[in-house]
Amino acid sequence: MNLNTLSPDPGSRPSRRRVGRGIGSGLGKTCGKGHKGQKSRAGGYHKINFEGGQMPIQRRLPKMGFKSREGRTIDEVSLGELAKLNDEVIDLVALRKAGLINNSIKDVKVILSGELTAAIKLKGLRVTKGARSAIESLGGSIEE
C-alpha cells in the first residue's frame, strides 16, 4: 500500500452537484448564489484580509525588527555531538566533513550538552564556560 494508490471506497464520496443545469436540478439559474450583489458576480468577493474599508490590522500595527544576517552564519554544536567524532583536531572543516554544519556556517559555538568521555582538541571554535571546563577537566585543549 502506498500513499499514491489510496482512494476512498466506491460510493463513500458523493460527486459534487453541478450547478446551472436547469430548474429541475435544484441548482439552476442563479446556481445557489442568490440575486445580484458582489458575491453573485464572477470573481466577486473581497480579499481575504479586507475589513470593509477600515484600515486593516496589518497596516495599523507598526513594523517590528528584522532578521539578522549574523544569525544565519553561526551555529551551535553540543559536546555530545563532538564526542562521536574521532578526529584528532576538531575545527570547522572537520565539522563540515562530519555533516554537523553546512557550508554557509562561518562560526561555531560549542555548548555544554551531552556526555563527553575522551579528551578532544578544538581549534578556531567558540566555547561556552561550561563546555570549556568539561573539556579541560578531561585533559582536552582549546586553541582560539
Curated annotation (Swiss-Prot):
GO terms for biological process: translation. InterPro entries: Ribosomal_uL15, Ribosomal_uL15/eL18, Ribosomal_uL15/eL18_sf, Ribosomal_uL15_bac-type, Ribosomal_uL15_CS. Keywords: Ribonucleoprotein, Ribosomal protein, RNA-binding, rRNA-binding. The keyword Secreted does not apply. Residues 1-45 are annotated as: Disordered. One of its GO terms (cellular component) is cytosolic large ribosomal subunit. Gene3D superfamilies: 3.100.10.10. Residues 21-31 have a biased composition (Gly residues). One of its GO terms (molecular function) is structural constituent of ribosome. Signal peptide: none annotated. Binds to the 23S rRNA. Belongs to the universal ribosomal protein uL15 family. Part of the 50S ribosomal subunit. This is Large ribosomal subunit protein uL15.
